[in-house]
């Protein structure tokens, strides 16, 4: 009788482990796109209703051309939040991913920490070859119907001890321009003196493994606060009343292709002119 009970318990635990592993593998391999709408007070009228396809932390994964074809014509720009590759990822795979993304829209990208450890020069060349634009502490003007939004790419320091530089200055005539910043590591907000209208970041993977009620298992205090999703804060000295930031869970995975309560994601973000009374 005791032996039968032990066998039943053992079998039950094995089944639970198999199901858990299958779920974690499924979450890590998703091609899901999270749809969001962000209200921006300073957004020019011409940009009202425009969309950004945002993806970060691809790492080793391959994008699906078949899946992303449905987003052609639905995004005005594609923004990559860094870690487009990592060590031992062939540049040919990176090129294939970038070619797929360039079919969705004009690509703008920043380096992530793993890009810098892998092959930054090769990655920069592949970006150029596929029509992408690498932003390294640079501003670029996005233009529609004579109106402009400033897109700023913040460069990733090689090590955290190197620190982040200040945001590149805008021309005097554009000091009140609507500004979108893409930066790999959201820790940048601790050093940025002036917050832009919108920040797009990655790096955290949302913790990748999250436990119910507890959250991310392997994030420090700052990243546990800013782990994934939409965030905003109020700065009395800022001209932007409600600066907003999206931290993506990322498309790829670190070390193992497993996730729990933290599925892989890409983003389609619709920009709307108006008061940022809530985040969607």
Predicted feature descriptions by range:
Residues 50-141:
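Membrane-embedded segments
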Residues 59, 85, 114-115, 139-140, ...:
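Catalytic metal-binding/acid-base residues of hydrolase active sites
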């Amino acid at each position: 009788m005791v032996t039968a009970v032990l066998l039943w318990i053992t079998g039950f635990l094995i089944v639970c482990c198999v199901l858990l592993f299958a779920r974690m593998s499924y979450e890590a391999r998703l091609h899901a796109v999270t749809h969001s709408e962000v209200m921006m007070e300073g957004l020019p009228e011409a940009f009202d209703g425009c969309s950004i396809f945002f993806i970060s932390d691809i790492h080793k994964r391959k994008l699906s051309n078949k899946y992303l074809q449905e987003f052609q014509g639905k995004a005005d720009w594609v923004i990559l939040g860094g870690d487009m590759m990592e060590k031992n990822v062939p540049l040919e795979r990176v090129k294939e991913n970038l070619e797929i993304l360039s079919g969705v829209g004009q690509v703008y990208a920043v380096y992530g920490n793993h890009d810098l450890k892998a092959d930054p020069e090769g990655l920069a060349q592949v970006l150029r070859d596929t029509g992408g634009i690498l932003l390294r502490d640079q501003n670029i003007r996005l233009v529609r119907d004579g109106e402009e939004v400033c897109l700023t790419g913040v460069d990733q320091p090689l090590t955290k001890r190197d620190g982040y530089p200040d945001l590149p200055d805008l021309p005097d005539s554009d000091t009140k321009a609507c500004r979108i910043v893409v930066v790999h590591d959201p820790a940048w907000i601790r050093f940025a003196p002036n917050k832009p209208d919108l920040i797009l970041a990655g790096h955290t993977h949302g913790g990748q493994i999250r436990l119910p009620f507890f959250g991310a298992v392997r994030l420090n205090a700052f990243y546990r606060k800013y782990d994934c999703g939409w965030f905003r804060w109020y700065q009395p000295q800022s001209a932007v009343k409600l600066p907003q930031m999206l931290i993506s869970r990322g498309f790829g995975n670190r070390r193992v292709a497993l996730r729990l309560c933290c599925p892989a994601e890409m983003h389609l973000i619709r920009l709307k002119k108006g008061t940022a009374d809530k985040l969607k």
